[in-house]
Every structure is written in structure tokens, then in C-alpha cells.
């Protein structure tokens, strides 16, 4: 049984507007009539560009990697709507995606709305079904700091690498952009393509012997002796 009363006035925050209608219906089917479901439409907070930081990234490596976070101007209207609804709700349920990015997104929403632990719960579900959401409501929790740190570290590394190396790559080799994953992935593709282009076909043979015993046929492959195996 959930510790969240069905008589409570709830604000449920999801990521995508496409989920609002379905999640609203499921909550009402579960008996939560006083529910409002709103979408954050993705991240509400981003790293601010800052000329006084490393490569204008808004990241300060010399200050224990302090980050200049800022509310995304494109989300002002969304945030105002979330703030207004959170003020009249008994509880805010942060139902962003159940992964590290969803955890970071939810944590930034918690900070923007200035929610303390008595005002919100974090709920996680892996499918938008009545059963999954019911289970999530029976097991509400709070933000996972370690997942948040992991997501924010990913954002920091992405921006530091991209901002520092993209201008250089554009100037010297005409690359469109440089990224933490895309550049490493591209190198693997290029290395593999070079192997294919440089491949020289060689003939080799396999030696098989067929045996018959008691009208049953056996086929064996010669792979060498106990001391030395045949390469080809």
C-alpha cells in the first residue's frame, strides 16, 4: 500500500507531453482523482556559457569543476506553470525517466521548485501501465545523488571536449564537430574500414577425416597435435 494518500492533491511531472494523457488516466484509474500531470519537455536547466570559465564552457576545473547552471530560457513558461501547480499540491511526484539523465533532470526540477524532502517523492517505472505505476507509487523514494552526479559529469565532459576541440578540428581537418563518444566511435569505424581495405586474401585449407563405425558416420577436423596446433 502506498504512503501517498489517494485524497492528496498531486502534481506529477513527466518528461514528455506525449505521456501526460495516459499517465493522468492511469492515476485516476488507481483512485487518485486530485492529480495534475505536467511535462517538463526535457531538461529545464543547462550549463551556461561563461567567458570567464574554461573555453567559455561555464565549467571551472580549477574550482573543483564548479559548474554555472542556468535555467533554460526556452523553459521559462514551463517552469512558471510547474511552480504554480507545485504551490497548491500536497506532494510533487517527479516521474522523469528511470535512468541517470532522468535523475539529473528530476533533480534540477526539484531545485528549481525549491522542494524539500517533505514536499516531493521520486517515482520510477519502466512502462506506462497501471501495474508499473501502481508499483512505483507503493515504493516512492528520493533523488539518487550518485545518478545525478554521473549524469552531470557526462554533461561536463561532453561540453569540455566539444567546446575545446571542435574549433580546432574545424580549422585543421574540416570536421563538423568533436564529441566524447562520436569521435571515439568514428575512430573505431575508420580503423575497421582500413583493415578491410588492407586485407589481403590468403588460401588456407581445413583437413577433415570421415570415419564409419557400426554404420554410423563421424567427421573430424584436424587441429594439430597436443604440442602444436595448426594455424591454417
Predicted feature residues:
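Intrinsically disordered, low-complexity regulatory segments
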Residues: 1-155, 161-164, 223-230
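Prokaryote-biased recognition of long, low-complexity C-terminal linker/tail segments
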Residues: 158-226
Amino acid at each position: 500500500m502506498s504512503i501517498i494518500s489517494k485524497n492528496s492533491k498531486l502534481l506529477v511531472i513527466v518528461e514528455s507531453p506525449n505521456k501526460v494523457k495516459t499517465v493522468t488516466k492511469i492515476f485516476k484509474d488507481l483512485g487518485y482523482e486530485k492529480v495534475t500531470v505536467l511535462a517538463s519537455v526535457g531538461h529545464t536547466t543547462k550549463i551556461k556559457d561563461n567567458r570567464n570559465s574554461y573555453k567559455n564552457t561555464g565549467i571551472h576545473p580549477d574550482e573543483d569543476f564548479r559548474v554555472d547552471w542556468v535555467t533554460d530560457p526556452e523553459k521559462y513558461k514551463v517552469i512558471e506553470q510547474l511552480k504554480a501547480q507545485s504551490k497548491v499540491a500536497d506532494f510533487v511526484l517527479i516521474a522523469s525517466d528511470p535512468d541517470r539523465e532522468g535523475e539529473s533532470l528530476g533533480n534540477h526540477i526539484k531545485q528549481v521548485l525549491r522542494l524539500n524532502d517533505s514536499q516531493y517523492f521520486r517515482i520510477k517505472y519502466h512502462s506506462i501501465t497501471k501495474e508499473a505505476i501502481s508499483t512505483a507509487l507503493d515504493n516512492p523514494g528520493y533523488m539518487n545523488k550518485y545518478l545525478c552526479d554521473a549524469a552531470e559529469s557526462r554533461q561536463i565532459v561532453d561540453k569540455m571536449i566539444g567546446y575545446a576541440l571542435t574549433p580546432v578540428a574545424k580549422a585543421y581537418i574540416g570536421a563538423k564537430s568533436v564529441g566524447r563518444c562520436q569521435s571515439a566511435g568514428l575512430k573505431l569505424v575508420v580503423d575497421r574500414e582500413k583493415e578491410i581495405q588492407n586485407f589481403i586474401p590468403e588460401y588456407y585449407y581445413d583437413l577433415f577425416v570421415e570415419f564409419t563405425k557400426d554404420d554410423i558416420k563421424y567427421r573430424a577436423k584436424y587441429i594439430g597435435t597436443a604440442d602444436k596446433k595448426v594455424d591454417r
